C-alpha cells in the first residue's frame, strides 16, 4: 500500500509541475497529464501493467460526477440566461447532429459497421468544458457576444445527451435493443434525470438553510454527498445520473448558500484533481505500440469532426438566431473533446467486444483535439477578432491580487468631494492604504505626494489582504420583476439590524450602494449578515 501511496503522490506533484510548465510554453495541461500517464504505462518508462478497464471506468465515472456537478455549480445563470436557449439546443440537437454526421462518415468512408459507426459518433459528440475553460482562463481570453457563457453552458450540459446516446448505441451493438426498448431507455434517462435532479436540489437547499455546520469544512463534505447522491439515485432507477448532477449543481450554484466562495474554491480543487485522474488514467491505459494501427482512422475522424460535423451542427443551430459567422466559427473550433469522451470510451470498450479498438481511436482523437484545437484556440480567437478587450483597468490589478497578499479597490471622485483640489500628501487616508494609480480620462498617472486630485478622477487604492475575517457571511439576493424591492430606493427598504448591503451587481457593473440608489430588475445584492 505504501508503494501505491508513494506513486500517487509523485504523480500528483508531477501533474502540478507540468501544469505550470504547460502554461508557460502554451501547451494545454491536459495533454501533459496524458503524456505522463503514457510514461508510467506498460509501454512507458515505469512499466506499470494496468489494463483493468472495468475498474478504470468506475474511477473515471466517479470523477466525471464531480466535473459535471461543478460545471453546473460554477455557471452564473444570470449571465447565461441570454444564451440559454442557444446553448441547450447546441447541447442536445447539436450533439445528435454531430453524432449522426460522424457516424455516417465512419460507415461510408471507413467501412465500419453501422453499430460501431454511430457508437463512435456518440462517444465524441460532446465537448469538454474543462478543456475549453482551462485554456480561456489561463490565457485570460475574454470573448465577444457572450460567447464565453454560450460555451460554458453548452459544454457543461452536453455530456448527459452524449451519455444517453452512448448507452443507447452500446445496447444496439450488443444486439439487445429494439426500437421500443430504446424509446423506453431515453424516456427513463430524461425523466428520472430531470425529476431527481430538481427534487434533490430543492431538498438540499432546505437542508442547507436548516443545518448550521459547527465545524469548518463540513459544508464542503455535505456538498460532496449531494454531488454523489445526485448521480447515484437516478442511476439506480436507470435515469441519467450525469444530467441530474448537472441540474443539482446549477440550481445550488445560483442559490443563496452560506460560505459559497469557499465551496467554489473547494470544488475547483476537486475538479482539477479529477481531471488529472481521468487524463492520467487515459495515458496509463493506452498502449503506444497500438497507436500506429489506429492513427489514420482517428485522424480522418478528427478532421471530419472538426471541419465538417461540428461546424455544420453549429451552423444549423445558431444561424436561425442570426449569430455572427465569426462567432459560429469560434464556437465550432472550441468543440474540444476531453474527459467525457474518455470515460464513455472506456465504458463502451468494456461493454462491447468488437474487433475495432474504439478506446485507442478515441484516445488519438482526444489527443489531436487538445493538441491542435487547444493550442490554436487563442490564435483563432485573435484572428476572428473575437477577443473582447477588457475596458476596466482593474482587471490587471485583480489578476495580480490573486497571487499577492494585497487587494485593490477603486473609487471615483464626484463633484465637491473633500479631496478635490488637494495634493495627495495633504489627504488623510485609512490606515495601511495607498493610492497606487489615478486614471484621468485616458491617462494613467502614477501619483506622488504632489499630485493634485481632480473631479472625476478614478483612484485605485491598495490594502493588505486579511489572513482571516470572522463574523462575515455573504449571501446574494436577486431582484426579480415581482419583488417588493423592485424600483425602490435603498433608503426606502427596511433591513434587518444585523445585515448590510455591501455591493450591487447590475449588468456586469459593480455599484457601491447608498440610500439614493434605486433597485431594478436583475440587480444582484451582495449582503453581509452578521455571524455570532
Which stretches of residues belong to each language-model region?
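Transmembrane helical cores of multi-pass secondary ion antiporters/exchangers
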Residues: 1-390, 403
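Cytosolic regulatory regions of ion transport systems
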Residues: 312, 318-330, 340, 344-532
Amino acid at each position: 500500500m505504501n508503494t501505491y501511496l508513494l506513486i500517487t503522490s509523485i504523480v500528483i506533484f508531477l501533474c502540478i509541475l507540468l501544469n505550470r510548465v504547460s502554461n508557460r510554453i502554451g501547451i494545454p495541461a491536459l495533454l501533459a497529464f496524458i503524456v505522463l500517464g503514457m510514461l508510467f504505462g506498460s509501454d512507458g518508462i515505469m512499466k506499470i501493467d494496468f489494463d483493468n478497464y472495468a475498474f478504470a471506468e468506475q474511477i473515471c465515472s466517479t470523477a466525471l460526477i464531480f466535473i459535471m456537478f461543478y460545471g453546473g455549480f460554477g455557471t452564473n445563470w444570470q449571465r447565461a440566461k441570454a444564451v440559454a436557449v442557444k446553448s441547450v439546443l447546441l447541447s442536445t440537437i447539436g450533439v445528435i447532429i454531430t453524432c449522426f454526421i460522424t457516424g455516417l462518415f465512419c460507415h461510408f468512408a471507413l467501412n465500419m459497421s453501422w453499430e460501431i459507426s454511430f457508437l463512435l459518433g456518440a462517444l465524441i459528440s460532446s465537448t469538454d468544458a474543462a478543456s475549453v475553460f482551462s485554456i480561456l482562463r489561463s490565457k485570460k481570453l475574454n470573448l465577444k457576444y457572450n460567447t464565453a457563457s454560450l460555451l460554458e453552458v453548452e459544454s457543461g450540459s452536453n455530456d448527459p445527451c452524449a451519455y444517453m446516446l452512448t448507452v443507447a448505441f452500446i445496447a444496439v451493438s450488443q444486439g439487445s435493443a429494439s426500437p421500443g426498448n430504446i424509446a423506453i431507455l431515453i424516456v427513463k434517462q430524461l425523466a428520472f434525470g430531470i425529476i431527481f435532479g430538481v427534487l434533490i436540489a430543492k431538498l438540499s437547499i432546505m437542508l442547507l438553510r436548516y443545518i448550521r455546520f459547527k465545524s469548518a469544512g463540513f459544508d464542503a463534505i455535505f456538498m460532496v454527498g449531494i454531488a454523489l447522491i445526485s448521480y447515484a439515485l437516478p442511476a439506480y432507477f436507470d435515469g441519467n445520473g450525469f444530467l441530474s448532477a448537472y441540474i443539482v449543481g446549477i440550481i445550488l450554484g445560483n442559490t443563496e448558500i452560506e460560505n459559497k466562495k469557499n465551496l467554489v474554491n473547494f470544488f475547483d480543487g476537486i475538479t482539477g484533481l479529477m481531471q488529472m485522474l481521468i487524463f492520467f488514467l487515459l495515458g496509463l491505459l493506452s498502449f503506444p505500440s497500438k497507436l500506429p494501427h489506429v492513427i489514420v482512422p482517428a485522424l480522418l475522424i478528427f478532421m471530419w469532426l472538426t471541419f465538417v460535423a461540428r461546424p455544420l451542427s453549429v451552423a444549423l443551430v445558431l444561424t436561425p438566431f442570426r449569430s455572427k459567422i465569426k462567432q459560429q466559427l469560434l464556437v465550432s473550433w472550441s468543440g474540444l473533446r476531453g474527459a467525457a469522451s474518455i470515460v464513455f470510451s472506456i465504458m463502451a470498450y468494456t461493454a462491447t467486444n468488437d474487433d475495432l479498438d474504439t478506446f485507442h481511436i478515441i484516445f488519438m482523437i482526444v489527443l489531436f483535439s487538445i493538441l491542435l484545437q487547444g493550442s490554436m484556440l487563442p490564435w483563432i480567437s485573435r484572428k476572428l477578432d473575437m477577443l473582447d478587450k477588457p475596458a476596466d483597468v482593474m482587471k490587471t490589478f485583480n489578476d495580480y491580487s490573486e497571487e499577492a497578499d494585497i487587494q485593490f479597490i477603486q473609487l471615483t471622485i464626484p463633484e465637491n468631494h473633500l479631496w478635490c483640489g488637494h495634493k495627495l500628501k495633504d489627504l488623510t487616508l485609512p490606515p495601511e492604504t495607498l493610492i497606487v494609480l489615478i486614471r484621468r480620462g485616458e491617462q494613467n498617472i502614477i501619483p506622488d505626494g504632489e499630485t493634485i486630485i481632480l473631479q472625476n478622477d478614478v483612484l485605485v487604492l491598495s490594502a493588505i489582504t486579511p489572513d482571516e475575517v470572522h463574523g462575515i457571511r455573504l449571501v446574494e439576493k436577486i431582484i426579480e420583476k415581482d419583488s417588493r424591492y423592485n424600483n425602490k430606493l435603498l433608503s426606502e427598504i427596511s433591513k434587518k439590524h444585523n445585515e448590510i448591503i455591501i455591493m450591487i451587481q447590475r449588468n456586469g457593473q459593480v455599484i457601491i450602494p447608498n440610500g439614493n440608489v434605486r433597485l431594478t430588475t436583475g440587480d444582484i445584492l451582495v449582503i453581509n449578515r452578521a455571524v455570532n
